[in-house]
C-alpha cells in the first residue's frame, strides 16, 4: 500500500513539473505594459521580465526638458511593468498550485 502511494505521489510530482514547464513557456509569451507620466513613458515586457520595448513621448526629448524627470519616468514605468508581470504570473500559477497545501503568502521560485 505504501509503495503504491509513493508511486502515485511521484507521478503527480512529475506531472506538476511538466505543467510548470509549460506554464513558464506560456508566461514568456505574455506581455504586460507599464506606464508612467500619464502614458508618456511605456515599458512592454514579458512575464519572464524580458523587456521588449520602451516608448518615450517625443515631448520628453525636447531641448530643455529635465533629464532627471525622464529617468524617473522610465524607472517608474519599468517598476509598473514588473508589478503587472508579477501579478499576472501569480494569477496564472495560482490555478496550478491551488491543490497544493502551501502556507498563505508562500512564493514559489518562478
UniProtKB/Swiss-Prot annotation:
InterPro entries in the record: YbaB-like_sf, YbaB/EbfC
Which segments does the entry list as coiled coil?
A: none
Chain intervals with Pro residues compositional bias: 101-110
**Ranges for region Disordered:** 88-110
Name the GO cellular-component terms.
bacterial nucleoid; cytosol
Sorted alphabetically, which keywords does the UniProt record give? Answer: Cytoplasm, DNA-binding
Q: Does the keyword Zinc apply?
A: no
* Cellular compartments annotated: Cytoplasm, Nucleoid
Hey, what's the signal peptide range on this chain?
none
Compositional bias, Polar residues, is annotated for: 88-98
Q: Which GO terms describe its molecular function?
A: DNA binding
State whether keyword Kinase applies: no
- Role, per record: Binds to DNA and alters its conformation. May be involved in regulation of gene expression, nucleoid organization and DNA protection.
Q: Which family does it belong to?
A: Belongs to the YbaB/EbfC family.
Outline the subunit composition.
Answer: Homodimer.
* NCBIfam families on file: DNA_YbaB_EbfC
Recorded protein name is Nucleoid-associated protein RALTA_A1934
Question: Which species?
Answer: Cupriavidus taiwanensis (strain DSM 17343 / BCRC 17206 / CCUG 44338 / CIP 107171 / LMG 19424 / R1) (Ralstonia taiwanensis (strain LMG 19424))
Q: What is the lineage of its organism?
A: Bacteria, Pseudomonadati, Pseudomonadota, Betaproteobacteria, Burkholderiales
Amino acid at each position: 500500500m505504501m509503495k503504491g502511494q509513493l508511486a502515485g505521489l511521484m507521478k503527480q510530482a512529475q506531472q506538476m513539473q511538466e505543467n510548470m514547464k509549460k506554464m513558464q513557456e506560456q508566461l514568456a509569451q505574455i506581455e504586460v505594459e507599464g506606464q508612467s507620466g500619464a502614458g508618456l513613458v511605456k515599458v512592454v515586457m514579458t512575464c519572464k521580465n524580458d523587456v521588449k520595448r520602451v516608448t518615450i513621448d517625443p515631448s520628453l526629448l525636447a531641448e530643455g526638458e529635465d533629464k532627471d524627470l525622464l529617468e524617473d519616468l522610465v524607472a517608474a514605468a519599468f517598476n509598473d511593468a514588473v508589478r503587472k508581470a508579477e501579478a499576472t504570473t501569480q494569477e496564472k500559477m495560482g490555478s496550478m498550485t491551488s491543490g497544493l497545501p502551501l502556507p498563505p503568502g508562500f512564493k514559489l521560485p518562478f
